[in-house]
Amino acid sequence: MTGKSVKDVDRYQAVLANLLLEEDNKFCADCQSKGPRWASWNIGVFICIRCAGIHRNLGVHISRVKSVNLDQWTQEQIQCMQEMGNGKANRLYEAYLPETFRRPQIDPAVEGFIRDKYEKKKYMDRSLDINAFRKEKDDKWKRGSEPVPEKKLEPVVFEKVKMPQKKEDPQLPRKSSPKSTAPVMDLLGLDAPVACSIANSKTSNTLEKDLDLLASVPSPSSSGSRKVVGSMPTAGSAGSVPENLNLFPEPGSKSEEIGKKQLSKDSILSLYGSQTPQMPTQAMFMAPAQMAYPTAYPSFPGVTPPNSIMGSMMPPPVGMVAQPGASGMVAPMAMPAGYMGGMQASMMGVPNGMMTTQQAGYMAGMAAMPQTVYGVQPAQQLQWNLTQMTQQMAGMNFYGANGMMNYGQSMSGGNGQAANQTLSPQMWK
């Protein structure tokens, strides 16, 4: 091979390489496979190796196949490839190919398609002259086949336009309906009905004064300005009531005024009238008549029921037993734990468990409460409240002529002989 021929081969390879760079020549003209390296120079198309074998079977009178890299090319062959190409050849041989046609991928189907395309010229535009079509310049058919390059449009700059904001309707202020405050109902009846707290302040103070069970006498400072509704005690009785509340007055000075300051039951009830609230049937400090001490011992006071307050404070009937002796003292025999005998004796009188004698001076400093404090006469059965009991206790004198009351004196009308009977030998067998 001469130098001239070597230069031509290199030049032809360069021309084929440039033809393969075109967009239509990058794919097989028949099966659209990528990267064809074979060509049918008489038809002027680039094909893949599989389609090249089928083209060889068609015969050299229809297709002549050459390799782009392995075979030597001549100037005539290069000229045929330059005149046609895949795009121009498909425009000629696939002019009537249906748009919905799908190119086959299996070898028998591909061979049948290639034979119909080049041997039978089934999809060829027969109106065109092949030689005249070959000699046409590439620019002429490219202008009609290739899409017109889109003009580069300048980027549109969108200006920010402030949209007019919708004017919101001014919200009308909602008129809040005043909440009706219902008067608070006192279901338990604990509050006293007061018409007006400001205008009737004196009336409310009066009601509070009436509801106080122990405030039987108005204070000296407010007695002139405030008037309590209801029957109030007179000035003479008002001064004597605080003194009557003292349960332990002095024996020397108070013994002379006992007759003047003792109040009757009618005067006590008249102090309160209708304003005094009634106590329940079972009074706090009262015991029914049937709960009194047995009639065999009339000198002892009545026994309070176990459910009352005074009954709960009293000890069980174990008590103390007084035995007469030379020393004149009381020898305690038994006493329940948690109780103070002296306090009970001074506050409650004689318990039902204490047995005494008629000798004077055995229980110094103690006095028996009258039977009327603990029990009510069966014929009367009146209900007393706390204030009435206080008035009765205030009017009593716990001291006798010698400064103390003899323990053996009977409050229920019994004599000394009945008290001595309690120490009979039969009681302790």
From Swiss-Prot:
Stretch list, region Interaction with clathrin heavy chains: 163-232
Ranges where the record places region Interaction with PICALM: 340-429
The keyword ATP-binding is assigned to this record: no
A Pfam family assignment: ArfGap
Gene Ontology MF terms: GTPase activator activity; zinc ion binding
Annotated localization: Cytoplasm
Basic and acidic residues bias (residue ranges): 138-172
Function of the protein: GTPase activating protein that acts on ARF1. Can also activate ARF6 (in vitro). May play a role in clathrin-dependent retrograde transport from early endosomes to the trans-Golgi network.
Arf-GAP domain span: 13-137
GO cellular component, one term: nucleoplasm
Residue spans of biased composition, Low complexity class: 217-231
This protein's name: Stromal membrane-associated protein 2
Keywords: Cytoplasm, GTPase activation, Metal-binding, Phosphoprotein, Zinc, Zinc-finger
